[in-house]
Swiss-Prot record:
Family, similarity comment: Belongs to the peptidase M42 family.
Enzyme class, first EC level, given as a word: hydrolase
Active site (catalytic residues): 205 (proton acceptor)
BP-aspect Gene Ontology terms: proteolysis
Top-level taxon: Bacteria
Cofactor(s) needed: a divalent metal cation
Listed GO MF terms: metal ion binding; metalloaminopeptidase activity
Cofactor detail note: Binds 2 divalent metal cations per subunit.
Alphabetic keyword roster: Aminopeptidase, Hydrolase, Metal-binding, Metalloprotease, Protease
Binding positions for a divalent metal cation 1 per the UniProt entry: 61, 175, 228
Protein name, entry field: Putative aminopeptidase FrvX
Binding site for a divalent metal cation 2: 175, 206, 316
Amino acid sequence: MNIELLQQLCEASAVSGDEQEVRDILINTLEPCVNEITFDGLGSFVARKGNKGPKVAVVGHMDEVGFMVTHIDESGFLRFTTIGGWWNQSMLNHRVTIRTHKGVKIPGVIGSVAPHALTEKQKQQPLSFDEMFIDIGANSREEVEKRGVEIGNFISPEANFACWGEDKVVGKALDNRIGCAMMAELLQTVNNPEITLYGVGSVEEEVGLRGAQTSAEHIKPDVVIVLDTAVAGDVPGIDNIKYPLKLGQGPGLMLFDKRYFPNQKLVAALKSCAAHNDLPLQFSTMKTGATDGGRYNVMGGGRPVVALCLPTRYLHANSGMISKADYEALLTLIRGFLTTLTAEKVNAFSQFRQVD
């Protein structure tokens, strides 16, 4: 696990629609070891390694959930809208970073009312998004604008990357910088002359899987492995039957989500690879969300796709948590699978005629 790369990626500000910082990190990381780097029309990062055999894509979306400045009042407070899925109770009094159009980062905090000034009824009611504001310590609109903050600036949670104990990693934007980091490690270490390997950092996943569609059209892959996160149900307050994934028990294979079913032969091949290498593997479903697999699997008449996810606590909030052991297990699983992949195996994934 390249913890330095993961930290660099997590500390980048790259809300959906503003992924340049992550794109730059991936360019600098992978340019020395790939044949070509290109981009689709929305800005998804595409690295190619090799030029022979079937096209195999490993995809991790670059964007994170965040906010955008929508109004600056006369007193210097900012109003904002959410980008991606947020729960309002996870937002109050958290520090944020505003990225100006020139790339300057301005710190702020989502303001909260002191309990002394709240009625008992108000204390029992969650604050709506429309009532929230951001304080950057300015005294007027003019001071805000002098610092370079404008309507339309993107806002991300403040970076807070850390390792806790021997196994846990905590930080913002683990969804889905872990996918980007793992994609990069695979491009650096997998050498299989039988396939053309693509590493994709897709854009705008959190607002509709948009970069998945455009990058799929750009590459036209034969097989796709999507890397993402999934809800860990091993904390108080979560139904662990609906959300069975646990940290430290291995990566999760997504059996279906709102927009995708995996190719069953691809699932069987990965399960066999995990068993052969004595790697733990969990299984999950997601009825209310989707991964980039939901766009890749229907492109060009349909493609074999599977989504593999790291169990993650506290998704779509300021601080998520993953297990290093789960990361290593998933990296080992995919590396082993890609290393032994051949054109014959790839073709077999799309053969649907029953053979006696």
